[in-house]
Amino acid sequence: MPARFSAALLAYRTGDQGPEVFLVHMGGPYWAHKDEGAWSIPKGEYDPTAESAQEVAAREFGEEVGLPAPSGPWHDLGEHRMPSGKRVRTFAVHTDADLAFVSSNLFTMEWPPRSGRVGEFPETDGAEWFELDVARRKLVSGQVPILDRLADAIR
């Protein structure tokens, strides 16, 4: 099976209690009533022979949040291998922008499984700022090590 690659952009800011990160809540019926472990860093798959990780990270942020990626210097947090084997290249950007969820692109899937009914659902259905300790609980478990990389990078 060929390797799968994703690129991500983790926006962060300095809050009253320390660093805060901007995460998106995964959309679709499976995630609708879940909170802890149901949030993600905006990201998307790409072919590294056809696109740059930075271009994809910016595009995916826009698609999943509905706003352009924050401007400012991007910090390369490197590549992280997910439990699925997918390789995620993450960039971080500090921002003072008042980011908020606007809209998300849609995807099509059969729901409930094996029902024969196909519907369109938002890829993400919300976004919020979280302090790092809270973000560790909210974030899907495979992405939590990325928060450690951010914490190390901004010390």
Predicted regions and their residues:
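The catalytic Nudix box helix
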Residues: I41-L77, F91, E131
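Active-site-adjacent beta-strand/loop module that shapes the phosphate/pyrophosphate-binding cleft
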Residues: E79-G116, E128, L150
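NUDIX/MutT-family hydrolases
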Residues: S104-I146
